[in-house]
Design a protein with these regions (language model features):
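Conserved NTP-donor binding/palm subdomain of two-metal-ion nucleotidyltransferases/polymerases, i.e.
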Residues: 1-7, 13-203
Length: 203
């Protein structure tokens, strides 16, 4: 983890605690959006601790298509409230989504940023490590991937995890071979754009 390329920190608090989170953070951060600004973005507001950017989310994600968004919010509400998994970070127990929802969420997050801004290899590694170390509820995963209409992107990314990063096919649910040409197009874009498009902005 010490060698992992850093990103920002996403903290999900939900709608009910959104304003309370802003109040609680004011005294411990170096920068924070004003109270009158926290609803400017439909998903989150921003704070900083030194140079580290923190996004405090009332919604984990918002889909552009209303029907898909309504469906996603139902899955997210369940995934962020039931069977939560505690992870200890620097002596603090942090609750993370259920393993079942997290499988989808890690993929959803990287796919969203791949389409909108760019990702680094670290996001692919995150998903590969998670799949390698967790038992995946394939019935639930198939339901959510199919319902959210992202089974093909899942399989495309999955083929890269297997063929480029060495994830076992047995650990990659719904693995199907994908053409090397398609894989190379995606890898080339990842390497050119970099983490959240940083490489393309630099060059």
């Amino acid at each position: 983890p010490q060698l992992r390329q850093c990103g920002d920190i996403d903290l999900y608090v939900g709608e009910a605690k959104y304003v309370l989170a802003h109040e609680a953070l004011k005294s411990v951060v170096t920068e924070i959006d004003g109270l009158d600004e926290i609803y400017n973005d439909p998903k989150h507001f921003h704070a900083k601790v030194g140079a580290v950017l923190i996004e405090i989310h009332r919604f984990a994600d918002i889909k552009e298509i209303p029907k898909l968004d309504a469906l996603y919010q139902k899955y997210a509400a369940d995934g962020f409230s039931r069977n939560l998994v505690p992870v200890e970070l620097c002596g603090v127990s942090v609750m993370t989504p259920s393993d079942d929802f997290n499988t989808y969420y890690i993929f959803n997050h990287l796919w969203h940023h791949f389409l909108s801004a760019g990702i680094g290899l670290r996001q692919l590694c995150d998903l590969a490590v998670f799949l390698d170390t967790h038992d995946v509820n394939k019935t639930y995963l198939e339901e959510i991937l199919t319902s959210m209409k992202v089974m093909k992107p899942w399989q495309t990314i999955g083929s890269i995890l297997v063929d480029y990063l060495g994830l076992s096919k047995d650990k990659m649910p719904f693995y199907v071979p994908v053409s090397r040409r398609k894989q190379e197009r995606i890898i080339r874009r990842i390497l050119l754009e970099g983490n959240f498009g940083h490489s393309s902005r630099m060059g």
